[in-house]
């Protein structure tokens, strides 16, 4: 199934839901998933959620990290990466010692196309149209766990763990 997905991606096409669900279902059958699993980025649409239901894949919890569009734009728009070694930076939260220069290797810092404001806004538009409705879907099932965004990954992780009782 993975090769099938790769052929779509290599052609610049969206991978059909049936292939995505097949990959997820196949992976969740592995022994290391018997006691639980975490999915990130799946499902992205109501049809995917419904297909997972039909495949018998049940979620105990669905975490929704609540964050404003403006905060997402600021965070993603501020990301930079070294063009030579790939080291990550952020203009506000993790700036390099010298602007535009990687602390690790001296390479030039660039902004990935994915992090440019127009791209982020387009992705947010798609999110609001296709993914946001999942919150209502999982809320009706009683498994939605909304969590307020925190300033750091560590703080957000802590809040999620507390919300899940871990």
Segments predicted by a language model, with ranges:
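Generic alpha-helical segment signature
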Residues: 17, 95-98, 153
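A glycine- and Lys/Arg-enriched "phosphate-lid" helix/loop adjacent to the NTP-binding pocket
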Residues: 7-9, 59-129
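Residue-level "edge-of-site" marker
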Residues: 21, 65, 151
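Residue-level signature of catalytic and energy-coupling elements of molecular machines
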Residues: 24, 38, 72, 127, ...
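Residues at or immediately flanking beta-strands
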Residues: 36, 62, 88, 143-146
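ATP-dependent small-molecule kinase phosphotransfer cores
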Residues: 1-58, 68, 77, 81-87, ...
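NTP-dependent small-molecule kinase module
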Residues: 108-166
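Conserved beta-strand segments of the P-loop GTPase G domain that flank and frequently precede/overlap
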Residues: 40, 64-66, 148
